[in-house]
Every structure is written in C-alpha cells, then in structure tokens.
C-alpha cells in the first residue's frame, strides 16, 4: 500500500512538472518572435515590446555593422521571425536583397527611420591596412537623443499596426522609454547650448546629427586610428593642425592603445578620448548595466572635455566646400552643353513646398544655420525661389524641343543653343547659366530660357533651375531671387525632400 502511495505521489509530481513545462512553452510560443540587426535597434525594440516579445540581435559585438553581410543561417533566422527590425537602408545595405529572397507573408519588416530625411553621407578612411566605408546618406541618427525618439515611435507604430490587441502595452512601454530619452535630450541641450568651444575633432564621422541638434560642429579627420600609430608624415601634419587651432582632444570610437595615446600626446600635444558610436555592446556590458543611456551620458561627459573649454574656432584640415557643385571652378573648365543634358520629364518642386512635404527640409537648414535663421525664414526664402505656375516641363534634347505645362496648358517650342554666361554671386562663389533661344518669334514668355544645375560641362542633370522671359537673355541674367526648380517627374515628394537635405 505504501509503495502504491509513493508511486502515486511520484506520478503527481511528474504530471505537475509536465504541466509547468507545458505552460512555460505555451507562454514562450505566444511571444512575438523579433529579430533586430544591431544594438540600438535591439534596445529600442525591447523597450517597446517588453515581455511580449522574444527579441534577438543579429549582429553581435565585435562585428562591424557597416560591413556585415548575412549568412544563409542569418537569412533563415530572419525568415522564421514575426518581425524584423533594422535601422535604415543606408546602414544595413543588404536588407532589400534579403527581403526579395524571403518568401513569407508572416514576416513584417520594419525600417526604424521610417520617412525620416537623412543628411548626406561621408566617406570614412581608416588607417593603412583597413578598409574605409561610405554611405550615400548618413544613417547615424540614433546618436542624437532627440532623433532617437522618432526611431522608437516608428518601431512602436509598426508593432501596434500588426498587433493591435497589444496596443496599450506598446504605448505604455514606449512612453516610459521616450520620457527617458527626453530627459537625456534636455541634459545634452543644457550642457551644450552655451558651449565655449563649438567644434570637436573625431576619427569616426558618426556624430553629425548629434552636432546638428545641439549646436556643435563635427570635424572628422583621417589617417589616424585607435590601434596603430600614424605615419611620420601624418603625425607631422597632424601636429601642425593641432597646434594651429590649439586642439585639446581627438575623439576615437574606442580607447586608443597606450602607445597611440602616448605618441599623440608626446608628438602632437593632444589627448585622446572616446565618443562611442553605440554600434554594439557585449553581453558582459549589457549584464553589467550598460545601455543606450549610460553610453550616451559617457559621450556627453567626453564631449564636455572640449566644449567646456574656451578656445579658437576649429576648422577642418582641408576645405572640401570649394567644389564645382558649390560654385568654385576655373573659367577654362567651363564647356558648352547640349539640350540633351536636360532631356526628360520634369516636375516643379513648388507644389511640395505648398503642401508641407518639404517642411522637414526647412528644419534641417535652420538647424544648419546655427540659429541665424528660423525654419519659417528658410521656407520664405525658398517660397520666393521656387514660385512658378509651370508645373511640368518635357524636354526632348534630340529634337531640341521644350514643352512647358503651365496651369494645365502645353506650350511647345524648338530651341537653339546660344552659349553660356558665368555669373559671380555675393558670397564669392560663381555659377554658370546655359542659354537657349526659341526659333518661334511667338514664344512670348518662353522666348529666352536659361538652365542652371551646378554643373559646368556636359553632364546629365539630376535637377535644375530654369529662368525664362520674353525680353532678352541679358534681362533674365539679372534674376537672382526666383529660380523655379525641377526634379524628375518619376520622383516622389519624399524622395525630392531627401535629395534637398543631402544636396
């Protein structure tokens, strides 16, 4: 009897253990399966989902996110998920290709940047023996607490859209996290709004959004790394640069080796500090309590080593602004062009200004002015510049025809090229207008036209400004305030806005 009783007890224990295990398995199976790319996306996603999702990170610490290419196993992991969250196509350049290879109606792909407009990317050179990387657009938006808020909101909205029954959970979780981001944003604003030194020199050009949002200037340098000493030639030029602007710190993305730090200190007279681009955290660091907030607070502390000390205005080692695109060129380099350079169907950007599509562009330009202009003042300037009633232009360069669609009516004329004119502007830069004249004496307002597209030789235009009139080429050359602007008709308003920010 006693043996039967013990057997019964053991069976009950086994049944209970099975039930507990089964309940845990059901709970685990009920969780949303989420794959994220690298650390910031991982943390932002976990902050939104909380305990309702099983969130994993594809790109582990020690792997360079810029250079990562998914393996077959990685693709299978993504395919098996309910949600896949990444930062932006300019960061994870492989995502679109992977999307095409995955045949799953259950997987939802989330781009954290959503419809955010991004600044132009920069090519980053590494020390000898290391490859650099470049981006068409700068993806490092997560390094500005202000913009991180938008990333979290975009992730939240994507989860709410797919799992409306969990809306309250996602909104509550994200609200708590965004409150912390807003507090961090305030800390940055308070510490940097009255910075004594507005410029900081960095080896990793990842902090342009941070600089833009908090009134600073990021100055990237090349030919130095945290791991190896610069060449004698680079060290000599760096020493000269450091002394010229009395630079106290050069920032690296990781702690410089003691040898590199000693060389820079002894030879160039400059110290090293870390600005962490937050592209990865190790499991050990995460378990130790490191996260977005601890790293960004450390970054602020490091920045203040420079911003709290009054000094000379630091400028870049080389001036890369004096390019043809910015209006700096030699007369001998200017050549004639044919109408074929502007062939295509083009749309005016003016309607997008009127409907608000370009509003974020004005915000960017106002921030870039460092307080000299408000977004409304920038918009007013472009309103005058873009204003036109010619909504579309169709150019057939082979036939030398231009069709103007004005208030819905078409006006088509044949043109001949009559040369170019170099103009000098108040800022000291210059521009070239390419002049054409209609063969039809009844072309009226479109008798004389002038193209300007920031190019000085035969090049297929990506966009252009067009000037026109009925009096003379000389009279039109005087127009400097109104420059109707045209982009390919195939582009959306969002794409045009992105081009204008990066332009």
Model-predicted segments: where are they?
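Calycin-type beta-barrel ligand-binding domains and close structural analogs
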Residues: 319-332, 396-503
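A mature extracytoplasmic/lumenal domain signature
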Residues: 59, 90-91, 113-116, 147, ...
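Extracytoplasmic metal-acquisition and chelation regions
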Residues: 5-10, 17-327, 333, 345, ...
